[in-house]
Curated annotation (Swiss-Prot):
SUPFAM superfamilies: Ankyrin repeat. This is Putative ankyrin repeat protein L273. ANK repeats lie at residues 71-100, 124-153, 206-237, 245-277, 303-332, 365-394. Signal peptide: none annotated. It comes from Acanthamoeba polyphaga mimivirus. Keywords: ANK repeat, Repeat. The keyword Ribosomal protein does not apply. InterPro entries: Ankyrin_rpt-contain_sf (IPR036770). The lineage of its organism: Viruses, Varidnaviria, Bamfordvirae, Nucleocytoviricota, Megaviricetes. It comes from the Viruses.
Length: 446
């Protein structure tokens, strides 16, 4: 049963003190002794701790509090007085600490009513499942399943199920949970159906964190269930160290075509890193998908500059042009220097099959973009950059020519030769774009 503080005391506190926001409520998780200690204090007075960093009261928001379920068995709902002259609040990792708190309610974490209360707060289902798993509470899990379990695929749940345990409650809980989580598989063809059931054998499963390492292997993302609760089936699995699991048999319950823009938004909502999604669309020349991501999601300056590098080496003019406009707009929102992580050698090693190593160390971001654009082989991209960086192309002519020879791009070699001979000397440098690239000098390690 939920433990409630005397409402008369709460009313007195509300009348006597102001709050940062009377509608703002904070939470923390504590053990039984902590609850006893709090109730032994006079609740009509603020609870005071002199050493906040060491002894202060930690609290956080409702969306974060279940990250701390290992701290105890009780959920405290509390508020903080705002205008008490002795109040001190400091920010700490994942929350705050204060020398004063005012308690509203205490909930037992193993109670189904507490679980329902947290569910109504729209807490992430993965966190709610972690709470249910702490107590191996099938009633909580059933409640969540009835409401429509929405979980991000995570290979940890397969590992938990496959771990041998002597606790039958734990085995049943893990089996029920695993049978309800849709995992992901990437394939080039859609599976057929047998008596209305789509069964797939010998499948490599992945989770949301590792999905985009697999996308080059197909154009469909399958959602599959592992039939671990069917006693007439013997499911075989094999784990590796690269975020993949081989499973002998699964049921396909849905699929998405990667040509459909909406699947990318769905995967980001599931927890896919939006930068991984953006790089995938650039490398696979999905222009409309790239435009959608740039329009609907926020990328920081370093992410945009790295994306521009990949667009240059991919040789797609339309994608490159779209990104370069976004990068120019982002430049004026921050004075942040360009990251030394944008390293030419690193990009060439990971993104390009470079046949020969050239001893060359770029000094500006422009140098990197020019080299990558030449490797990408798009004459249109070089022509776009020409009106901004004519002099830089002249200065880098010899190194750019070496790269064009390595990649046997005759059109690129002819263009660079004509630029060097002055055939395009009437191009004027655009100072705005010039400042975007050249004020950011790279820090390179020799």
């Amino acid at each position: 049963m939920d433990l409630q503080i005397d409402q008369k005391i709460i009313n007195e506190l509300l009348n006597e003190r102001d709050y940062f926001d009377t509608n703002e409520t904070y939470y923390c998780i504590v053990d039984q002794q902590h609850v006893i200690d709090l109730y032994q204090k006079d609740l009509t007075e603020s609870i005071i701790s002199d050493n906040i960093q060491k002894d202060g009261y930690f609290f956080t928001d409702i969306n974060t509090v279940l990250d701390f379920i290992a701290n105890g068995e009780f959920l405290l709902q509390l508020k903080v007085p705002s205008k008490n002259h002795e109040l001190v609040v400091i920010s700490v990792e994942s929350g705050w600490k204060s020398n004063m708190i005012l308690m509203d309610s205490i909930y037992c974490l193993d109670s189904i009513s507490t679980f329902e209360f947290l569910y109504k707060k729209n807490i992430d289902h993965n966190k709610l499942v972690s709470l249910a798993r702490k107590y191996l509470n099938s009633e909580m899990l059933d409640f969540l399943i009835d409401k429509g379990l929405r979980m991000r695929p995570n290979l940890k749940y397969i590992s938990d199920w496959a771990t041998i345990t002597n606790n039958p409650l734990e085995s049943r809980f893990n089996s029920k949970l695993l049978s309800r989580i849709p995992f992901l598989a990437v394939t080039d063809t859609l599976p057929g159906q047998n008596n209305g059931i789509c069964i797939i054998n010998n499948v490599i499963l992945t989770d949301i964190e590792n999905l985009f390492c697999e996308l080059s292997k197909g154009k469909f993302v399958l959602e599959v269930l592992i039939p671990v609760n069917e006693f007439d089936k013997k499911i075989l699995m094999n784990f590796n160290s690269k975020g993949k699991v081989w499973v002998s048999e699964v049921y396909c319950v849905g699929y998405q075509n990667l040509d459909d823009i909406s699947i990318l938004q769905h995967l980001i909502a599931l927890g896919c890193n939006k930068m991984h999604v953006l790089l995938f669309t650039i490398k696979s020349h999905r222009e409309s998908s790239t435009t959608m991501l740039l329009s609907n999601y926020v990328f920081d300056k370093i992410e945009l500059e790295y994306a521009l590098c990949i667009a240059a080496v991919s040789g797609n003019f339309n994608v490159f042009s779209s990104i370069i406009n976004t990068v120019k707009n982002s430049y004026y929102t921050t004075e942040q220097k360009i990251s030394s992580l944008i390293n030419l050698d690193l990009i060439l090693r990971e993104e390009v099959n470079l046949p020969v190593r050239i001893n060359y160390t770029p000094t500006t971001y422009t140098d990197i973009i020019l080299v990558l654009a030449v490797i990408g082989g798009s004459v249109e991209i070089i022509c776009l950059l020409l009106k901004y960086f004519y002099q830089q192309i002249i200065d880098n002519y010899h190194i750019l020519t070496k790269y064009s020879i390595m990649y046997e791009n005759g059109d690129m070699m002819d263009l660079l030769r004509n630029i060097y001979k002055g055939f395009y000397s009437n191009f004027q440098t655009n100072n705005e774009s010039d400042s975007l690239f050249n004020k950011n000098i790279l820090k390179t390690d020799n």
